[in-house]
Amino acid sequence: AGTVPDKSLYAFPGVGLEGFGVLQSRFHENWCTYFGNRIGAGNQRRYNASYVYLTFPFPEGLTPDIPTADYADDPRAQAIAAAAARLNELRENWLNPPELIERVPEVVEGYPDRILPKDEAAAKELKKRTLTNLYNTRPAWLDHAHRALDEAVAEAYGWGDDYRAGTLTDDEILARLFRLNQERVSA
């Protein structure tokens, strides 16, 4: 409660853990940085589905127009999904540590449990635990989880060796993604 989503909220229906992983990767982040909009006094990035999501070249065979069940057995999708699940688990444990919260079953079947602070001290601490604060402090475990995810995504593109060799700079990633985008638009 206290937060009402507006037109700035984007939902990605039908995107499984592998799609979530690609969207959380350095590859998509670079695409967002280059093709996304800027807004406000701080010139903050703003996601734009038309310029970013719809033009982003997902790894071949793992694109959002293909049902996730169709590539469930693809080792590339499985590796991305595993790394994405681990990243999500680590972030969730930091955002909502078991010692500060209790999970209460939702009254409507099928909805996730409600997360409630155990007491007022927990509520105060939980208010500080935001994704923004987490990424601003960038603990080592978060970097490790993102590197594992980025490696899985690089493998899906066929760029795993270059990623491990450290030759995939942000500019090189963007150039390769742009070439893929152009190839797919031309096909």
Please place each PLM-identified region on the residue numbering.
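S-adenosyl-L-methionine
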Residues: 1-187
